[in-house]
Amino acid sequence: MTADKLILACSNCGAKNRVPISRIDEAPKCGKCKKFLPVESLSRPVIVMDNTFDREVMSSSLPVLVDCWAPWCGPCKAIGPIMDELAIKYRGRLKIAKLNVDENPMIGSRYSISSIPTMFLVKNGRIIDKLIGALPKEQLESQIARVLG
């Protein structure tokens, strides 16, 4: 896959489809079964769990910004809308993933997440950067730019 194409799995037949980023808004269809591909999910954060983390984050063809949060955490709630905005802005270039650490303790333990919010940027299955605290949108975008560079 090149930087100007995405690989999208068809939710109907499971076939993998190469879709140019420039054509995402044209309602692309699966090359095998001709059903519409699930592009709407590219514009919102993906909820990940202990059992989906490796597939959604570590094996992603796109870089991923993972937001580790908990429902009782005020600063986590404050950055939620920022994550939604970033998912829209970087659609097709960066995946935003949200991990509730209270419900998914294995990943929190694996990556030594001891305070929240904690975010980390993953590219090609490797953690590139770990960010702790409710960072302003501008600072997050600066870190994202380094990864997308």
What positions do the PLM features span?
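Thiol-based oxidoreductase modules, predominantly thioredoxin-like and allied folds used
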Residues: 68, 83-106, 113
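Conserved redox-active cysteine motifs that mediate thiol-disulfide chemistry
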Residues: 68-82
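Short linker/helix segments within small regulatory modules
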Residues: 19-29
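Short pre-active-site segment immediately N-terminal to redox-active cysteine/selenocysteine motifs
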Residues: 61-62, 68-72, 115
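Cys/His-rich microdomains that often coordinate metals
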Residues: 14-17, 37, 80
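Short cysteine-rich clusters marking metal-coordination/redox-active sites
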Residues: 10-13, 30-33
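A short beta-strand-turn-helix
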Residues: 46-64
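Non-catalytic, surface beta->alpha helical segment in thiol-disulfide oxidoreductase systems
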Residues: 115, 121-149
